[in-house]
């Protein structure tokens, strides 16, 4: 099994593309959902965030106030690094758990939906393939204005706050161009799924695990039949 990192930009159509992959039966892990999950009350990251930033980051029900926390780390590299040092290990741990579940179920590849895949670069080394859902800037701007009922100025500000899609496209191994008709984009997704599904890149890990399991079974057989004393 291998990992596929998928990202996009605001109003690029990433969520719609993810839905198509899921309809095709693909395994998808949303890293944003994991990030929200691991900071819930009762989890280690929640306790460490409160210890590091104080009870002012808590809502009345004990949940983390994401807006307050975001304001605290805004333009504060040291605080942002501290928060990342708390959350990233827990995110990776949960991500690996979910990935292993899909491995046991026989999936050949798993898609990781990672909004900041190229910005943080922390998970890039684990990705066998990277995919960007792209659209040209004019299309992105028009979609964002229509979807969020924004002025042109506000929409442009939101787009400028992100790494440009054209830069992400240059860094990605695969680009799904969602600038035109949705039927064309959907066809690209289907073709990419077929390419990934028929790839043999999943074999090394699966063979390695099977070899390891065979070794353990063989060792247990030797222990029970030849090396351990009979009762």
UniProtKB/Swiss-Prot annotation:
List the protein's name. Answer: Dephospho-CoA kinase domain-containing protein
DPCK domain residues: 3-207
Q: Which UniProt keywords apply?
A: ATP-binding, Nucleotide-binding
Q: Which InterPro entries match?
A: Depp_CoAkinase, P-loop_NTPase
The reply on keyword Magnesium is: no
HAMAP family recorded: Dephospho_CoA_kinase (MF_00376)
* SUPFAM superfamilies per the UniProt record, alphabetical: P-loop containing nucleoside triphosphate hydrolases
Choose any GO biological process term that the UniProt entry carries and state it.
coenzyme A biosynthetic process
Mind telling me which Pfam families this protein's record contains?
CoaE
Q: Which family is it part of?
A: Belongs to the CoaE family.
One MF term in GO for this entry?
A: ATP binding
Give the taxonomic lineage as stored in the record. Eukaryota, Metazoa, Chordata, Craniata, Vertebrata
Annotated Gene3D superfamilies: P-loop containing nucleotide triphosphate hydrolases (3.40.50.300)
Q: Which domain of life is it from?
A: Eukaryota
NCBIfam families given for it? dephospho-CoA kinase
User: Where, in this chain's numbering, is ATP bound?
Assistant: 8-15
């Amino acid at each position: 099994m291998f990992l596929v990192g998928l990202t996009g930009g605001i109003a690029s159509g990433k969520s719609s593309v993810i839905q198509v992959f899921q309809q095709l039966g693909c395994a998808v892990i949303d890293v944003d959902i994991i990030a929200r999950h691991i900071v819930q009350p009762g989890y280690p990251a929640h306790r460490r965030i409160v210890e590091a930033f104080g009870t002012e980051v808590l809502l009345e029900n004990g949940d983390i106030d994401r807006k307050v926390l975001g304001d605290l780390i805004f333009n504060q590299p040291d605080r942002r690094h501290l928060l990342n040092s708390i959350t990233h290990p827990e995110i990776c741990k949960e991500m690996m758990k979910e990935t292993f579940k899909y491995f046991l179920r026989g999936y050949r590849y798993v898609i990781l939906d990672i909004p900041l895949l190229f910005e943080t670069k922390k998970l890039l080394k684990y990705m066998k393939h990277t995919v960007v859902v792209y659209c040209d800037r004019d299309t992105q701007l028009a979609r964002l204005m229509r979807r969020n009922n924004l002025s042109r100025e506000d929409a442009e500000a939101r787009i400028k706050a992100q790494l440009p899609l054209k830069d992400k496209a240059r860094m990605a191994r695969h680009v799904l161009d969602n600038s035109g008709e949705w039927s064309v984009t959907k066809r690209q997704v289907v073709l990419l799924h077929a390419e990934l599904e028929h790839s043999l890149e999943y074999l090394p890990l699966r063979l390695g695990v099977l070899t390891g399991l065979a070794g353990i079974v063989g060792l247990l057989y030797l222990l029970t039949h030849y090396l351990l004393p009979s009762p």
